[in-house]
Amino acid sequence: MVYQPAAGARDLLPLDVAQKRWIEDKLQQVFHRWGYHRIITSTLERMDTLMAGEAIQRQMVIQLQNSEDEELGLRPELTASIARAVVTRMANLRHPQRLYYNANVFRRIWENRHNRQQEFYQAGVELLGVGGLLANAEVLLLAGNCLTALGLQDWHLILGEAGITRSLLDAFPINLRAKVRSAIAHLDRITIDTLPLTDELRERARIMLDLRGNSADVLQKVSSLNLDAEQQEAVNNLKSLVELLESGGKFPIILDLSLIQTIDYYTGLVFEIVNNTDSQARVLGRGGRYDQLLGLYHPQGENIPGIGFVLNIEDLYQVLLSTQQLPQETPASDWLVVPENPAAHSAAFAYAQKLRESPDLVRVELDLGSTDRATIKQYARDRSIAQIAWIKADGSPIIEKVSQ
């Protein structure tokens, strides 16, 4: 019998890990430079915690039960877990809270594909306790800084505003609103043309479908929809944000007020980070503002504003593969320490440890019993080990540089 990983699971071998760590280390450096601190939440959550935001479908959660028959689930995303942790464990801390994570998530994918991946790796940030223009700009600029740090050039940010989109949908009859929303989310003009709408509402839906493109053009189009005071204020805030982002130089934005995320706890900004390739556009991450989510977990129901984004490590990996930036092999050891005979075993361990205690990271291997010097040298060449220390019984070393 050949034992394989469970369906939807996979192993990461040393080179996979080195490449994943390269991406994560670059992102972590950016998070630290912006003043964010890492948070680690439980992989297991109570199902009522995961379902509280009404944004996660129960069937996508991989569920478990404990000995008390309590329903548990493997987290399908991080924001709900962090929201729960912040209001229950960090309530006395001052805001804003700048948090980042680097973790795995689990999702049951209901598609007709055998062994569809169910474990994913993500990195992201949450900025909690503050709303407004500057907080929104910080998170978007931080996302752009992450991509720049990874050496990615051909990306853009698709920016929407869930509050504006929802309020524009309020003009439609309640019994048709969900269908109009779905049609706009999927850019489905045929459905818009066939729904039983008045001419005025049908034209409104068509305009909403076209609220995508250059920021100045989109803002002009949405202003033609006879907005009320609240909607106009939201549009003005969006305009101020775009102007701030673009004032610092080129920041690639596509404004899209038809952008509707599948996770429905967003109350303001929503965005996707997209990379352009010759063959397709790949979504590298997404995020948005969720000013009512934390209130669902707060004992007194107090709303705490929040905004964040997540980057998908696997998608970043696929894009970076073609750039030749990722490590192409695992790090080589610096030394191979070889006891020349059994009497030198203790001295060899001591010498290897002395090398390892260097202030700089030094990778040191000990030969574990090879008797043929030619075999030892070939091993060092195959593993790109720079130096061999041959240890005599009296502890004295003979250093040999390995020609590659």
Curated annotation (Swiss-Prot):
| Record CDD domains | HisRS-like_core
This protein's pathway reads: Amino-acid biosynthesis; L-histidine biosynthesis; L-histidine from 5-phospho-alpha-D-ribose 1-diphosphate: step 1/9
* Molecular function GO terms recorded: histidine-tRNA ligase activity
One Pfam family cited in the UniProt record for this chain: tRNA-synt_His
Instruction: Fetch the Gene3D superfamilies from UniProt.
Output: Bira Bifunctional Protein, Domain 2
Q: Which InterPro entries match?
A: aa-tRNA-synth_II, aa-tRNA-synth_II/BPL/LPL, HisRS-like_core, HisRS/HisZ, HisZ
What's a GO cellular component annotated to this UniProt protein? cytoplasm
Major place of residence: cytoplasm
User: Which BP terms from GO are recorded?
Assistant: histidyl-tRNA aminoacylation; L-histidine biosynthetic process
Q: Where is this protein localized, as stated in its record?
A: Cytoplasm
Q: Keyword set for this entry?
A: Amino-acid biosynthesis, Cytoplasm, Histidine biosynthesis
Highest taxon in the source lineage: Bacteria
- Whom does it interact with, and what assembly results? Heteromultimer composed of HisG and HisZ subunits.
What else is noted?
A: This function is generally fulfilled by the C-terminal part of HisG, which is missing in some bacteria such as this one.
Family to which the UniProt record says this protein belongs:
Belongs to the class-II aminoacyl-tRNA synthetase family. HisZ subfamily.
Any idea what job this protein has?
Required for the first step of histidine biosynthesis. May allow the feedback regulation of ATP phosphoribosyltransferase activity by histidine.
* Protein name (record): ATP phosphoribosyltransferase regulatory subunit
Q: What is the lineage of its organism?
A: Bacteria, Bacillati, Cyanobacteriota, Cyanophyceae, Nostocales
Which gene specifies this protein's sequence? hisZ
